[in-house]
């Protein structure tokens, strides 16, 4: 993971935390445990960075729902 994608992951963790009213540490654990960071956010960084954070948070929610991750 390069510096740009790392910063993007941190930004998206905070965006999800704000929308879900959760602590960023909680969101990080859920995203890491589900593989969302390494299998979805980082590989799709180039595409995702051009979308709004609301759209990306929705995509992350869909990713987690498909894997039966609750939060």
Task: Please name every model-derived segment.
Residues 1-71:
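C-terminal alpha-helical interaction appendages
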């Amino acid at each position: 993971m390069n510096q740009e994608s790392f910063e993007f992951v941190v930004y998206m963790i905070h965006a999800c935390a704000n929308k879900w009213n959760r602590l960023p540490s909680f969101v990080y654990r859920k995203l890491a445990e589900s593989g969302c960071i390494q299998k979805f956010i980082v590989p799709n960084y180039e595409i995702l960075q051009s979308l709004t954070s609301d759209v990306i948070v929705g995509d992350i929610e869909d990713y987690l729902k498909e894997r039966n991750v609750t939060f």
